[in-house]
Amino acid sequence: MKKALLFRLAVLVAAMMCALGAAAAEAYACYTPSNTTLTFYYDIQRSSRTGTTYDLNTGYADIGWQTDGTNASVTKVVFDPSFAGARPTTTSGWFYDMRNLESITGMSYLNTSEVTDMSYMFAGCEKLTSVDVSHFNTSKVIYMGRMFDLCTRLTSLDLSSFNTSHVAEMRSMFSNCSNLRTIYVGSGWSTAAVMYSTEMFWNCICLVGGQGTTWNSSNPTDKTYAHIDGGTSNPGYFTDKNASLRGDVNGDGSVNISDVTALIDYLLSGRW
């Protein structure tokens, strides 16, 4: 009798373990009003979370925290370590118009390898002073329109990991980033596929390229200047991340006598 009970108990435990293992993890976000935090998870614990939970991969027009107005209350966004297992296909509008958002932590847990749309992702984040997108995999992204529009407190962006070979739309990507001074890019940056880029740098009044090219309202605001600054011969608004070596004034990736010459020319030009 005792052996039979133990056997049944073992079978029951095994069945429970199988059921638990079979439960599929899901990607979702949970808003907690008590600390005005929106947290992203990828697990099987959604039903036990305290707060309001939202589906992901819904598309920009159907994001739950946008349609119910929660976005205006969020002050902090957190990516839980579990979210590293998620593979979202869109991040469009995720933080759109979060005008009170002050910080985003755990961004390294956001895997963007399957994302095709990043439009409006950070648009309107007026209180955000920094955002770490340096690890983003953008090899499948097609849309980046208004991605950082109206991020008025950002002073620098590191886009050195970006591969933009498939991006077709960059309209107003950095528009109204009125305090943005430096945009770092790497070898993966390209505008070859870009079809739409109007007002890409509209009102980026503080922007300076790696060799001193400054934003000017008389310059084209489309993709024309969306490349690494080559100085007067090929002016651009970006800075080569690989050339940001201390003392590398001319951005050629090394420190030598030519940097002294470039520095003298820069000082004599009066652009400083």
Where are these regions (language model features)?
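Alpha-helical segments with a strong preference for the paired helices of cellulosomal dockerin domains
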Residues: 249-272
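Negatively charged
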Residues: 23-243
